[in-house]
Regions:
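Bacterial Sec-dependent N-terminal signal peptides
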Residues: 4-25
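Extracellular beta-rich repeat passengers
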Residues: 229-400
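Extracellular beta-strand-rich solenoid/capping regions of secreted or surface-exposed proteins
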Residues: 68-74, 85-101, 110-128, 134-150
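Extracellular calcium-associated, cysteine-rich motifs in secreted modular proteins
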Residues: 399-458
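Right-handed parallel beta-helix
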Residues: 97, 102, 123-134, 149-165, ...
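Acidic Gly/Asp/Thr-rich repetitive segments characteristic of extracellular carbohydrate-active
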Residues: 33-78
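Structural detector of coil-to-beta-strand junctions
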Residues: 116, 144-146, 166-167, 199-203, ...
Length: 458
């Protein structure tokens, strides 16, 4: 089946009748954000809300109905009618004003495999439940996913693995201060298994005026850069597992000014086994700090005993200090400690304790809809061993799935008008399954009807 576009002009709800406006039976989610539960600097992205619906109907790399065709033009809400592995024959670049809703796929969902993807310049982007697995077929020295410039993006429930440079980087050019990545969130996602000899989680490097939020993510099986940070950063409710001797959270190591809110994260040491049988060992949770890096640190825990039980201790400021002797004088190096988060950082409304974040990630993190795939299940099995398992790999063939693994397919639900919303959903919520224009009408809660369908997928 070819890709389907459903274009219409969205209308605001005025409550007067049901002919031109969508009379909403949907929940009132409060403030209209990228989606309910969006947090941080990227929470106000609107994606393709004022555009058209595009349906991905083939796993082919290119052509009508492909993901590549879907993201080649702006102003689209992209849904999926197929499940399986999309093997990229070349890098994939995303346009502006897109909503990618991979949780709409049937079966086990979709995996984008075999090459890098770029969100550089993809302003106003919402990307959810997409698995990005580059692997050895991607070029050496390239990230699995990356952003060099662009603004107002949010990535939710992603799983990004097997980068040959970094896995997921947001890395601006300091020589271009007006073209920095800014207002970006990565949340509820897995970033892991960077490939040796350069196994890295990612660079999160902007300037002091351009914010990035990392909320409730799992960094796993990366030797270093989990992540490496410069600029304006929120790092809240993340779990780091099985990093190596390169570093966990790396604090800039530069004269550039940074401001970070680092709260309620859990650092858990794994086996640190390298693919070649060597033990890499793990660094301290925080490294390469100096006075130019200002940080509020609170509620962070560290479990390094590898006993299979989550029983870490709370980190203190002394865990972020280094003593040295220069010309007979003792020198203490540390970040500049803040007594509270800077007011510039957005409130995290879903703030949890570090242990609650661990439990939530185990149960819900990553590309968990429509179902966790074998790779993410493997990562969770490692994490929940709490020090008994873990591998820093050289190639995706080093893990039991031997690559992307098996992705179950299934038929997409019936959709008479081909608007991206199943008939069953339209019947249940009083929409017209013979009218493709109702997908993009704005409901009384401020979201389009098709967005409301997407939000209700469980």
């Amino acid at each position: 089946m070819a890709g389907v576009l459903c274009a219409c002009s969205p209308k605001s709800y005025d409550g007067r009748d049901g002919n031109n406006f969508s009379v909403s039976p949907f929940p009132d989610y409060g403030e209209v954000l990228a989606f309910p539960g969006a947090e941080g600097y990227g929470r106000h992205a609107t994606g393709g809300r004022t555009g058209e619906v595009y349906q991905v109907t083939t796993l082919a790399d290119s052509g009508k109905g492909s993901l590549r065709d879907a993201v080649s033009k702006p102003n689209r809400i992209i849904v999926f009618k197929v499940a399986g592995v999309i093997k990229l024959e070349s890098p994939l670049d995303f346009s502006k004003n897109l909503t990618i809703a991979a949780q709409t796929a049937p079966g086990d969902g979709v995996v984008v495999y075999g090459n890098r993807i770029s969100f550089s310049g993809a302003d106003n982007l919402i990307c959810r439940y997409l698995r990005v697995r580059m692997g050895m077929n991607g070029r050496e020295g390239k990230d699995a996913a990356g952003i060099a410039y662009g603004s107002d993006m949010i990535f939710d429930h992603m799983s990004v693995t097997w980068g040959r440079d970094e896995c997921f980087s947001i890395n601006g050019d300091p020589k271009k201060p007006a073209d920095q990545p800014r207002n970006i969130t990565i949340q509820n996602s897995f970033i892991g298994q960077g490939l040796q000899p350069h196994s890295c989680g990612g660079l999160i490097q902007t300037t002091i005026n351009n914010g990035v939020t990392l909320y409730r993510n799992l960094y796993i099986d990366n030797k270093t850069r989990n992540p490496k940070v410069k600029g304006l950063n929120q790092f809240v409710n993340n779990v780091l597992y099985n990093w190596g001797n390169g570093g966990a959270y790396i604090m800039g190591d530069t004269e550039q000014k940074s401001d970070a809110d680092i709260r309620n994260n859990y650092f858990i040491v794994g086996t640190t086994d390298n693919y070649d049988g060597k033990k890499l060992g793990a660094t301290a949770p925080f490294t390469r700090y100096n006075e130019h890096f200002s940080a509020y640190l609170s509620g962070n825990f560290y479990d390094d005993n590898k006993d299979g039980v989550l029983n870490g201790r709370e980190l203190e400021r002394t865990d972020c200090m280094k003593k040295s002797v220069v010309a007979g004088e003792e020198i203490i190096t540390s970040p500049t400690f803040l007594e509270r988060p800077s007011d510039i950082h957005p409130e995290i409304k879903g703030l949890m304790t570090a242990q609650e974040a661990y439990e939530w990630i185990v149960d819900n993190g990553g590309a968990s809809l429509p179902a966790r795939d074998e790779v993410d299940a493997y990562l969770i099995d490692e994490l929940t061993s709490l020090g008994k398992k873990g591998l820093i790999i050289h190639t995706e063939e080093d893990i039991p799935t031997k690559g992307a693994g098996s992705i179950k397919s299934a038929n997409a639900p019936a959709d008479t008008d081909n608007d991206g919303m199943p008939d069953e959903f339209e019947d249940k919520y009083g929409l017209d399954k013979n009218d493709p224009a109702d997908a993009m009408k704005i409901a009384s809660n401020g979201y389009t009807n098709i967005e409301n369908y997407i939000f209700l997928i469980k």
